[in-house]
Amino acid sequence: MEKTVLIGIITHEQGLEKSMDYLDELAFLTMTAGGTVTKTFTQKLNNPNPKTFIGEGKINEIREYIKENNIQTVIFDDELSATQERNISKIFNCKILDRTNLILDIFAQRAKTSYAKTQVELAQCQYLLPRLKGMWTHLERQKGGIGMRGPGETEIETDRRIVRNKISLLKNKIKAIDKQMHVQRGNRGKLVRVAIVGYTNVGKSTLMNLLCKSKVFAEDKLFATLDTTVRKLVIGNLPFLISDTVGFIRKLPTQLVESFKSTLDEVREADLLLHVIDITHSNFEEHKQSVEKILSEIKSLNKPTLLVFNKIDNYQAVEIEADDLITERTKKHYTLDQWKKTWMNELGENVIFISAKDKKNIDDLKELMYSKVREIHVTRFPYNNFLYPEII
C-alpha cells in the first residue's frame, strides 16, 4: 500500500464540513486505488495560490511531514494546473496527484472490456496533453544558451504530436464502437428501457443482481462498475430491458463524461430512470444533486424517474435526548419515517425506500416498476394494453 497524504482547502463556498466530506470521499478513492492515508491537511484560503495551490507556510509544514514519514504520494482534492503540479512536485520531491488523476487511475484499474479501456485511455491522454511540459523539467536546464537552444521544447512538441495523434486514433476507435453499440441498441426492438443511475457505491449493482437474479460485479468500493450491463427483465408478464451504469461522483472529470459517452447513451436512451440513493450517507442530498447535474448535462434530467432510497437496513438517525432543549433539530436527526414523509410529500408515488441487501420492500419496488413500465408501454402500443393488467 502506498503511503499518502491528502490536501484540501476550505473556502467561502466550501466550508469546513463540506471540505471534510470531500476529503473523506478522497480517502475512500485512495483506498480503492490501493493507497493508505497517513494524514490529511487542510488550509483556509479565499483563492488557491496560482503557483503552489496552497500557501507557503502550509507547503513547508507538509514538506517536513513527507520527509519524516517517508510519504510516497500527495493527493490534492481539487484539480491542479500543469504549473501547480510541476512546482509542487519540485518542492515535495514525490508523486503528486489530484482528484481527477486519481479517478482516472481507478478507472484504468477497473476497465475490463476493450471499450472501457479505450474510453479511459482517451480521458488519460486528454488530461496528460496540457501537462507534458511539466514532465520535461529534467530538460529545463538545457533550455536556451549557446548551443543549447530548445532541445527540451523539441522533445515536448514531439510528445504533444504523439499524444494528439493518439487522441485522434482513440476517438475514431470509440466512434466506430459507438456506431456498433447504437446498432445493437436498435436491435433490441421496441422494449421499454430502464436505466439504474446514482452516485458511486450506492448499491446499484446489488439491486440489479437482485432484480435480475444475475451476477453483475458488486463491491463496497468506488466505481466497481465501469461497463454497462443490460439484462432483460420480466415482471408479471411484462418484458423490458434494464441497465446498470457507471456511478457518478462529485467533481467528476469532464474528460470522463466525454469519454464515457456511449455508457451515458444508455441513460440518454432510457425511457425510465431508477435513481438509487444511499440514505445512510450524511450528504445523500448533495449526492442526489450531483447526479442530477450530470443528468442535466446529458439532457436526461426530465425523464420519468423513480427515486429508490437504498440501505434502509443500516439507517440510523442522530439521536437527541428528550430533555435536550439546546441542540437544534436538523435533517441528520430525521427518523426514517420523517424522511419518507418528506420525500413522499414532494414526489408522491415516485419514491420508495428499500434494502437491496435484506431484500426489504423489493416486491413493492417491482410493482412500482411494473406500473411505470406498463404506462410507457401502453402509450407506445395502445392496441395491446389488454395483455398487461394494471395490477400484477
Where on the chain are the PLM-derived regions?
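N-terminal accessory targeting/assembly segments
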Residues: 1-103
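Conserved Switch II/interswitch segment of TRAFAC-class P-loop GTPases
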Residues: 13, 49, 79, 268-289, ...
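Switch I (effector-binding) loop of TRAFAC-class P-loop GTPase G-domains
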Residues: 186-189, 210-240, 249, 254-262, ...
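C-terminal-of-GTPase-core extension/linker across diverse P-loop GTPases
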Residues: 2-7, 27, 126, 130-202, ...
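Conserved catalytic network of the ASCE P-loop NTPase/AAA+ motor domain
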Residues: 66-68, 89, 232-236, 241, ...
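Switch II of P-loop NTPase G domains
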Residues: 20-24, 47-63, 227, 246-269, ...
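Short alpha-helix plus adjacent loop in nuclease-associated cores
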Residues: 102-120
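Switch/connector loops and helix/strand junctions flanking conserved nucleotide-binding motifs
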Residues: 14-17, 52, 82-87, 104-107, ...
